Amino acid sequence: MSKIFERIDKYTALVMQSHVYVAEDRDDIKRNLDRALNLIDYGVGYFWELPARLVVFPEYFMQGVTTPGKGEHAIDDFMKKAITLDGPEMQVLGDKAREYNLYIAGG
């Protein structure tokens, strides 16, 4: 085995795919985020043999995929559902990452 791999502790990577509601408002984003947080709690508890250190979610896991022309007409409609780095969603994900000492990635 390569020496570099001898220095890396084995861990579990959780690759998550959940049902996502297409967000019409911030409440829908919260519902999607709550579902994601519950999946993290479940996954960390399920894979107890090796600690979970990485959780990966797909793109749009908080807002869902929207289609321009189907009710969304301007950048303002998209900005109402935008996730910002200093916003509450990122704070909650950061808290969850610290709780379990892991990294969370999402598109």
Language model features with spans:
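Hydrophobic structural segments
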Residues: 1-107
